[in-house]
Amino acid sequence: MDRQNIRIRLKAFDHRVLDHSTREIVNTAKRTGATVRGPIPLPTLIEKFTVNRSPHVDKKSREQFEIRTHKRVLDIVDPTPQTVDALMKLDLSAGVDVEIKL
């Protein structure tokens, strides 16, 4: 019989919020009897933006800003129906993007 997997990808700008949400998902899955692989940290995406400090002159004077997107992956192996229900009812922090694939 084919093994059922649930893959959960989490993205957030703040790594502390991301780790807290990951811990909540892992604890919920383990409490309902499923096995969890991960969390696996994926490479952090760093987007840098360079802008002129002055609107008029001084082209050499610039300022840089960056956005860091932290990512994690979890695999839930052989989830029970209770696991799926508990994950659907789970309320995660704002600012965490969750993608679920079956």
From Swiss-Prot:
PROSITE patterns xref list: RIBOSOMAL_S10
Keyword tags: Ribonucleoprotein, Ribosomal protein
GO biological process, one term: translation
One Pfam family matching this protein: Ribosomal_S10
InterPro entries per record: Ribosomal_uS10 (IPR001848), Ribosomal_uS10_CS (IPR018268), Ribosomal_uS10_dom (IPR027486), Ribosomal_uS10_dom_sf (IPR036838)
Molecular function in Gene Ontology: structural constituent of ribosome; tRNA binding
UniProt record similarity statement: Belongs to the universal ribosomal protein uS10 family.
Function: Involved in the binding of tRNA to the ribosomes.
Subunit structure: Part of the 30S ribosomal subunit.
Listed name of the protein: Small ribosomal subunit protein uS10
